[in-house]
Amino acid sequence: MKKISSPSFCIAKVIDEIVGYMEQNQGNNKSGIIRELHESNRLLPYFNKIESDYLDAGENLQSLISKLEQSDEVLGIEKSKMKELYKTFYSSESSFRRDLYKLTPRCCPICDAEWGYATHTLDHILPESIFPQFAILPINLVSTCYRCNHSKNSIVGYLESQGVLNPYFNSVNLLPYLKCYTYIKGDDFITHIQLKNESVVGLDPLKYKRLRFFYEEVYKLNEAYSEVARVSVLNSLIDTLSELGDVTNDFIKGDFQSLIMDDKEDLISKGVVTLEFLKVLVLESLQDLEVEAYDLINRMLQERRQMSEVQDIF
């Protein structure tokens, strides 16, 4: 997770647009209370204050939410109506949403999935279902992929050992901490992309717990990366090897080793979890397996070549 640029607009601009809309659409079910709060000079000062508190907490948002009480309303505005304000003023046609999307032009800042393979959404870092006061706050809205958004759902790290990571303030280079564990089940490989053990990563215990909470509990990246490794990376390796003709176990192992040595350090320095990096992790784990792993690879190669022959005839 790389740190990204903060939004170019603040809550005052959002409130200004909301107030202007409500003044022109007084039949709206939220118009009365919004105009009343605005005219009594309570609306903008309140949201300016929570934005300021959020920014002050910054990379330690857990310290902010530990002081907050959960509420079903904000200045008398029901939680459901705060959600409606978000849906209206951050709709797919909204300039606010477009501006936030521009902050992550290439990929999801959480899992590094590239757009085109993943779909943009806006994620409430502090969930609107729990903290409605942050529902329309720009600094609480991050452009992430659909999978990360819905994996997180309403999970919040209230404890110091859990924490809350927001890409506007925090960054984590996951690559040095990841390892692939592969084993054979039946006639297939099972892969798990997991965090290395605490004893070998060199982090203090609190940071390691926060990293594990982020990786496994909040965004479930272990599940996402493991699935990609099994379905995409392994299949791609088999496809590539199947085009080489007959290969020995020693050839396969040597080919794997050269790919690992050539790529790993450069990939880690970039700090992005790409297919190439996952491939290196898978190759490392395959090298740790016994000869039966290479026998299974050769059987898979034979099956893949037979499939290719059938496809060519078809």
Which residues does each predicted region cover?
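Short cysteine-rich loop/turn motifs with clustered Cys
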Residues: 96-120, 145
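Glycine- and acidic-residue-rich phosphate-binding/metal-coordinating active-site segment common to enzymes
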Residues: 116-202
